[in-house]
């Protein structure tokens, strides 16, 4: 039985609505991510969606395909550094390109640049393909692309490769104190 595609809804009351009992026993040994624990602590409803990890393609576009969601609804989290705000996180649609000038402006800075991939784990505690705006090692400013408002729900990484959290954009904003701005070209 392929357990990867079973839909799991986790509510703040910690009740699991799961399709079958076999999935319950498989999930008991798996620890929740920091992202999920933060949402639980804030009583924010979300859906945890899992899919098989392809180490050759860790993109948000691939995640969207695996989740059968529009790529514009699956947001990737990018880590950048600005001259005034320091390290920041930008959540943008999976196939979009980050506009660094727009990010700098949103962060009240003059300049922004992407951090090197080798720095991401040390800065956030997350691996490439599993970087979440929730639960990083430090609390960095989070900027959410304005296109998120077009959706009732968006998906962001749960903090582990192959896991996405689906939640309302307003709930993500509240959880990470995000600033919404036009961040893409």
Language-model segment annotations:
Residues 3-185:
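Extended, low-hydrophobicity, polar/charged segments
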